[in-house]
């Protein structure tokens, strides 16, 4: 999870491959109207996001029931969005926030080709982002690390039980 340009898709694909899991790209579940809205530089609002989260949550749950393990790349910027996904998925759900500096994220977006999300929306995503709370089954990783290092750190966290942030500090 994280804002645009944080490396969600890169880490998600690597992690899914390493775990033998199915990878789902959350961006693929946006409807045409939401994609057009973002492409035109308008940020999404909750009314745009709820149906997307419902489609993604249903797809994750269906895939879990068939294949057992799923990794999904999804912004999940607010706690309420993460809670919505958790409610839709009948298996334990963990979140990994990829946290990067605004400068690094802007640079990544400037160098990214072929994506509908313009870099002009980064500021609104950063304002919307609610960092993971201590009671969430989540961890935060430094988006500046290499994809291989992020994958290794994610696997280590998952192997340790993927405990909520407050339990990691004990």
Descriptions of predicted regions:
Residues 13-56:
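Conserved substrate/cofactor phosphate-moiety recognition/catalytic segment
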Residues 64, 75-113:
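ATP-dependent NMP and nucleoside kinases share a basic, alpha-helical "lid"
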Residues 158-170:
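C-terminal accessory "lid"/substrate-recognition subdomains
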Residues 53-57, 147-158:
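Short, amphipathic alpha-helical "lid/cap" segments that border enzyme active or binding sites
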Residues 70-74:
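Structural recognition of the conserved hydrophobic beta-strand(s) that form the central parallel beta-sheet
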Residues 8:
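Conserved lysine of the Walker
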Residues 3:
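P-loop (Walker A) phosphate-binding loop of NTP-binding proteins
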Residues 111-153:
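Small-molecule kinase domains that catalyze NTP-dependent phosphoryl transfer to phosphate-bearing small molecules
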